[in-house]
């Protein structure tokens, strides 16, 4: 699922509503959220599925004059750097995802270059697969004579795999 928070087309359908729709769509396993500076649309979104947030237009913070649409000019603590921090806090990461420094969690990653989206999403989804595999092993270990769906072996009571 790909979501753009560009404020022009869906101005009354903000990121929290997209997050709600994502959570309730069984077909969607993850989302890419494309964000622009301006507005607090994304801050209150609560994601239950993995997300890669692409926060763009950081260069605007270096300008001495306002440019862009009204939402991008009207804000305060809603510039690109602030939005990056919001998502980093949500995902529990301490930096931006780049090929040189792939920072991500099972919850998500933050990129500023759209070219990094595929690699970031792949890393996040692999982290979720590893998490799911570990949970299956833990569950199978807790149940007597349970079959491990990952390795297809039987577990005997008081023994390992």
Language-model regions, residue ranges each:
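Catalytic-core regions of core metabolic enzymes
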Residues: 1-161
């Amino acid at each position: 699922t790909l979501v753009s928070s560009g404020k022009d087309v869906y101005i009354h359908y903000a990121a929290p509503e997209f997050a709600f729709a994502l959570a309730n769509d069984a077909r969607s396993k993850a989302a890419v959220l494309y964000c622009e500076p301006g507005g607090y649309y994304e801050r209150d979104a609560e994601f239950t599925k993995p997300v890669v947030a692409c926060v763009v237009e950081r260069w605007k913070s270096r300008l001495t004059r306002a440019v862009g649409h009204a939402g991008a000019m009207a804000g305060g603590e809603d510039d690109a750097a602030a939005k990056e921090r919001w998502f980093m806090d949500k995902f529990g990461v301490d930096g931006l995802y780049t090929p040189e420094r792939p920072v991500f969690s099972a919850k998500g990653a933050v990129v500023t270059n759209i070219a990094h989206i595929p690699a970031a999403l792949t890393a996040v989804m692999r982290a979720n697969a590893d998490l799911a595999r570990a949970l299956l092993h833990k569950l199978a270990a807790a149940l007597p004579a349970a079959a491990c769906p990952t390795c297809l072996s039987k577990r005997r009571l008081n023994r390992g795999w």
